[in-house]
Design a protein with these regions (language model features):
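Extended hydrophobic-aromatic, low-complexity segments
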Residues: 268-271, 284-285, 293-296
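Short, solvent-exposed amphipathic alpha-helical segments in soluble enzyme
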Residues: 272-277
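Classical protein tyrosine phosphatase
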Residues: 265, 278-285
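HKD-type phospholipase D/PLD-like phosphodiesterase module
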Residues: 1-2, 6, 21-253, 263, ...
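A short acidic, Gly/Pro-enriched loop at the edge of an enzyme's catalytic core
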Residues: 9
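Structural motif
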Residues: 16-18, 260-263
């Protein structure tokens, strides 16, 4: 990824839950790319709750803000999405580590010019050094353009980060731009949802891909997305449902499938659909409890690994 960032000439966009507060090597790579390529524009999109959790101590926001100070907001953009589900007294009193359960920006899209890495990994040391995760590299201008529009669409519905020297600010300020197509989710959650739905709905249906010359390729890409709670519908649920239903019918029956998940919290409907396929063989790959990021943590979160293990046993 660092090599692709350094070679990028026009654009880099990075959508992730958060960037580790000690990822100075990644920031140094982005800085070098901006210095070497004067036409390069870099856009970061993270989650607000997770990206500012440690404030006023170092956080994703404080790590990224100096890039804006150095290269200016026209070349470096840092946006942080905030769920409209967490406002008022709920936001004030729910502990920070728990409040993320009310909604997050969870896309992992790492685009450089006309290539994109679609991943499940955040940009932090644990994921770089101690996690097994998916990294799919696509060399496709059409696909990279499409997800750039998704990234930009959510960025325009997010808070803007700027550097700040104010005492206790943690090195950054977070404001809601007047140019955003929706009011702040903290000021008017219902109007935010309504405006956000209008802004994002057209992006769920990409334009038809241009016809291509016949080839031996057997790979077809179907982008599926879930923008809950911004939209009441998603393309993720119907697409996965259709695929699983198809596996239970001829000529795909009996089929072979592999189900992978870091956290085994399969919904009842997906569980029924998977079991209904009566596969020739089925493989479930999930994390061992000791490999779970919540293993050994204090409070309710420390109970999650055992809960996922229980769900896996129930499935078997």
């Amino acid at each position: 990824m660092q090599d692709k960032i350094l070679k990028a000439q026009r654009r880099v966009y990075l959508s992730t839950l958060y960037i580790g507060k000690t990822e100075h090597e990644l920031i140094s790579t982005v800085r070098s790319a901006l210095q070497n390529n004067p036409d390069l524009h870099v856009s970061f999109l993270t989650d607000s709750l997770r990206g500012t959790r440690e404030t006023p101590d170092p956080s994703s926001a404080s790590l990224l803000a100096p890039l804006i100070a150095e290269f200016g907001p026209r070349r470096v953009e840092v946006r942080m999405y905030h769920t409209p589900n967490l406002t008022g007294l709920r936001k004030k009193y729910i502990p920070k580590r728990i409040n993320e359960g009310w909604g997050l920006q969870h896309m992992k899209l790492y685009g450089c010019d006309d290539e994109i890495i679609m991943s499940g990994a955040n940009l932090s040391s644990d994921y770089f050094t101690n996690r097994q995760d998916r990294y799919h590299l696509f060399r496709s201008k059409e696909l990279t353009d499409y997800f750039a529009r998704i990234h930009d669409g959510i960025a325009k519905l997010s808070f803007d980060i700027q550097p700040s020297n104010a005492e206790g600010a943690g090195g950054y300020s977070m404001t809601w731009p007047s140019s955003n197509p929706a009011p702040s989710p903290l000021d008017s959650p219902s109007k935010y949802r309504e405006s956000a739905a209008k802004h994002m709905s057209h992006l769920l249906t990409p334009a038809n891909s241009p016809p291509t010359a016949s080839s031996s390729s057997t790979t077809t890409i179907y982008p599926v997305l879930s923008f809950v709670p911004l939209l009441k519908t998603s393309t993720e649920l119907p697409a996965l449902t259709k695929i699983l239903q198809s596996l239970a019918t001829a000529p795909l029956h009996p089929s072979t499938w592999t189900f992978t998940a870091g956290y085994f919290n399969m919904t009842p409907s997906f569980r029924r659909l998977l079991l209904a396929t009566r596969p020739a063989s089925g493989t479930v790959l999930t994390a061992h409890p000791h490999a779970n990021g919540f293993f050994g943590s204090k409070g309710v979160s420390g109970m999650l690994p055992a809960a996922y293990t229980h769900l896996a046993k129930t499935f078997l």
